[in-house]
Structure formats: structure tokens, C-alpha cells
Amino acid sequence: MNDNDSPRALFVFAHPDDETILSGGTMARLAAEGAHVSLLTCTLGEEGEVIAPELRELAADRADQLGGWRIAELRSALDRLGSPRGARISQHWLAGPGRWRDSGMAAGRNTHPRAFIGGDFGEQARAAAKTIREVRPHVVVTHDPEGGYGHRDHIYANRLVVEAVKIAAAETHSEFGAPWQVKKLYWTGIGESAWRRAIKELGRRAIPDGFELVHADVAKPRRDEEITTVVDIGDYRAAKLAALAAHATQITVCHELAAFALSNKALTPVPAEEHFLLVPLRFGAVDNQDLDNRNPNSQPPADQAREDHLLTGLGFA
């Protein structure tokens, strides 16, 4: 296939469910529009808190079988995000499922020998670069440098992807394919105005017993001017909610309110748009590449128009 036959997008996240929470609507829209959509997940999410009482024995401090269960949940979620025309979202695991383990939320270094944040960074970055060369994506999407609400695996995954994009473009490591330069790199995020508006709208509704409205600062929203790309997912919000429900050990979905909650029971809105931050990519000489990792406190140039699609400017109809 010619590299320009159809658009390809690779989403890279730390745990199962990150993809749906942060960009599920965009993944569904891209798949429906005919793009080849792939997901690279770095861990099985073994340290997640199980909210379903009948499944709590799967937890890490009990039977420690949650990772395998979440593989099936993720497969179901991706099926629900896939196109009605039968397009599938391809699943990849960083060096194979279970190679690295969820590091958990607790502060301090996870002492598990396979903890994601304790792994060999070079080995992990090369594994991610191998997937990039296999998929040959025009667009890569991952966590922001602060990891959203600060999860250490999210922060680590951001660093990993930045390095992997550079490795994939270099004239090295021919054992895992020809070099590939990613055209656009995005971080996930949400603008402050849209986030607070969504919470205000949800707050006008009757919140189910046992839940509370999420606090506005939990998502660590971005200043509006930092957001470069706003994708309309109105037609795909139902698919996103269905995919969220597939992650049943981690998420409770309230379809009638277009909202969900994690183990904290904080009801969180699912807006009809998803936001991203475009990261400048500059590749110089083969042996002297440079990726400009945008300062999270900076903002796009004043003359940069806000995008409405991840494929903007790439020449795809």
C-alpha cells in the first residue's frame, strides 16, 4: 500500500480505559471516516481499583487477575468504538501484553520487577518505536506531560512516546523496519471553559444517589488558548459511552446523563467534543533530530487557527 492511500492514527496510552476516557469519540469518528486506527497500550492496568463487587477478588491485593480481565474489557471497548461498516481498531501492547505492569497510583517507586515506571526506558522506547514503524501512523496521540490528573504512568508514557517518535524516524534499528516520520503529534487535554461549562450543565441534572458531581479541578483543564484542536464527537458520543461501559471493573456509566464515574463515585460529563494540543515536530539531520516538546505553559502562535480534525493539513479528503 502506498503510504498516502489512507490516513493512519496511533493512540498510545498507559492503561486500558485511558483511550476511551481521553479520546474514544475521536477514535470512533476516525474509524467511521475510513482511517486506520490503532491503539498501543503500555500496561494491563493491573493495579486498578475494582468497583464491581462480584469481581473484587480479581484485584492486585487479592487474586491479582485483573490484568487478564481488562484485556477482554479493552477488546470489547474497541469493538464498540469501531465503525458500523466493520472497520476494526487494531490493538497493540508494548512489547506484548503484560511485559510491563501498572505502577499504581501510590507515591514512591513501585518495587514490582515489571513496574512500568521502573522499566528500562531505552528498551521501552524502542518497543514503542517498533510499533510506530509497523503502523506507520501519520498522527500519534498520547497523554500530556502532566499525565492529566498526575498519574505517574501517564507522565512516563508521554516521555516514552516523545522518545519513540524520534527513534522511529532515525536511520537506526533497521531490525524493526524502515524509518518513519510521524507527521503530527498530539497530547490529550480539555480547555477550561468547555470543561466548566460541561460540569455546570451536568450539575443542573438530578445526580443519582450514591454519586456526586466531579470537582471542576480534577481533570486539570488547560487554558483555552493552549487547545489547538477541537474535534466534534456528537455523532459518536453514544459509542464512547458504550465503550466506557465495557470497562466495567473501572467505570460506571450513566447513559441518560452522558456521564461516567470511576471508583471515587464522582460523576464526570462526557462532552460532545474532545480537545487536543498539537506538539511542534522538527526533524533535522538523521543524526541530529530534535522534537520540540512544547512547554505546557506556552500557547500556540497567534496566527495559528484552531483545528477541527486531527488530520487537518495532511492532504486527506
Curated annotation (Swiss-Prot):
User: What cofactors are annotated for this protein?
Assistant: Zn(2+)
The processes (GO biological process) annotated in the record are: mycothiol biosynthetic process
Q: Which residue positions does the secretion signal occupy? A: none
Which enzyme type, at the first EC level? hydrolase
Q: Which reaction does it catalyse?
A: 1D-myo-inositol 2-acetamido-2-deoxy-alpha-D-glucopyranoside + H2O = 1D-myo-inositol 2-amino-2-deoxy-alpha-D-glucopyranoside + acetate
Q: What is its EC number?
A: 3.5.1.103
Task: Give the top-rank taxon of the lineage listed in the UniProt record for this protein.
Answer: Bacteria
Pfam families given for it?
A: PIG-L
Q: Which UniProt keywords apply?
A: Hydrolase, Metal-binding, Zinc
Residue segments, region Disordered: 289-317
Chain sites annotated for binding Zn(2+): H15, D18, H154
According to the record, cofactor stoichiometry and binding are noted as: Binds 1 zinc ion per subunit.
Q: Which GO terms describe its molecular function?
A: N-acetylglucosaminylinositol deacetylase activity; zinc ion binding
Q: What does this protein do?
A: Catalyzes the deacetylation of 1D-myo-inositol 2-acetamido-2-deoxy-alpha-D-glucopyranoside (GlcNAc-Ins) in the mycothiol biosynthesis pathway.
Family affiliation = Belongs to the MshB deacetylase family.
Q: In its UniProt entry, what is this protein called?
A: 1D-myo-inositol 2-acetamido-2-deoxy-alpha-D-glucopyranoside deacetylase
